[in-house]
Regions:
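Bacterial N-terminal signal peptides
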Residues: 1-4
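Phosphate-group recognition and catalysis centered on beta-loop-alpha active-site segments
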Residues: 7-288
Length: 288
């Protein structure tokens, strides 16, 4: 049976039901594992899957046209021990062989870890239907990516992730059964502008919408921004479309923030603190 995720209000299987049926919590580990462990490494992805949640992978292409998982444009932050001749060079200008020599694990612990190819990640997902992954798009040829996904039989395990609705529509035309996430950051004005645009386009192809939640302005009496009333209104609108509403509390580590969001009705998170988020989520859901 094949389910298509059209992002409209029609009868369809909700992403949260897909996850629940496979014993996966609707929680995204930002950049693969949050701030606790290395970013975008295969070891991190596996650890996150074993926690029962979903890693995010950032994808780029090397000079020899291999898709790799890495967030930054160069190795300066993630592999600070890189030689001076390479540290500021874009990954798009170095080969896979060179990229594989970089240690992207030690900046966050003692472990030495390398940059994985997307092919390596996909191989680790094949045969494991509970291993989902958010693929945060960064200038990858969509036809090539779609072919890779189909070759590995991962059409329903990939969550195509971007802030550009037109890219989700393009992706959905290639793999209509794929999940997707549109993330919305920046100012409240930008959030409103983005919602107006996707509303005009009938939320086409979107199965999850993520809003970034941040600390309030100093003069504000609200617990976070956007304010709870605005979040609830957008959540209601999104849910009516059969779309999963997700929030990313940006660098917010206070447990009470997550509890307040759950009390508002939020049922999906992206987080830099997955262990804490899992604990709060499970305890809250057991209490209701």
């Amino acid at each position: 049976m094949i389910f298509t995720f059209s992002g409209c209000g029609e009868n369809k299987l909700s992403p949260i039901n897909v996850y629940t049926d496979l014993g996966v919590l609707p929680i995204q580990a930002h950049r693969g594992g949050g701030l606790r462990i290395p970013e975008n490494t295969l070891e991190t992805f596996i650890e996150t899957w074993e926690m029962g949640i979903i890693p995010e992978a950032d994808i780029r292409t090397t000079s020899d046209d291999v898709i790799i998982c890495i967030h930054d444009k160069n190795s300066k932050r993630l592999a600070p021990n890189t030689s001076d001749s390479l540290i500021n060079i874009s990954f798009s200008e170095i080969s896979l062989a060179v990229a594989k020599t970089l240690d992207v694990g030690s900046f966050r612990g003692d472990q030495v870890q390398s940059i994985p190819t997307l092919e390596e990640v996909f191989k680790s997902m094949s045969g494991h239907p509970d291993r989902f992954i958010y693929l945060d798009y960064k200038k990858i040829d969509l036809d090539r990516l779609a072919n890779m996904v189909r070759d590995h039989g991962l059409e329903r395990q990939i969550i195509f992730t971007t802030k550009h609705h037109n890219l989700i529509i393009d992706w959905h035309s290639r793999i209509p059964e794929s999940l997707s996430l549109l993330w919305i950051g920046g100012s409240l004005e930008n959030v409103k502008k983005t919602f107006a645009s996707i509303r005009e386009n009938q939320f086409e192809g979107i199965t999850t919408i993520q809003i970034h939640v941040k600390y309030p302005d100093v003069e504000s009496d609200q617990p976070f921004k956007p304010a709870p009333d605005y979040l609830q209104a957008r959540m209601k609108e999104v849910n009516e479309q059969g779309i999963l509403f997700q929030v990313l509390p940006w660098r917010m580590v206070e447990p009470e923030v997550y509890t307040q969001l759950l009390e508002l009705g939020v049922r999906s998170f992206a987080t830099d603190y997955p262990i804490m988020t899992i604990d709060i989520y499970k305890k809250y859901m057991e209490s209701i």
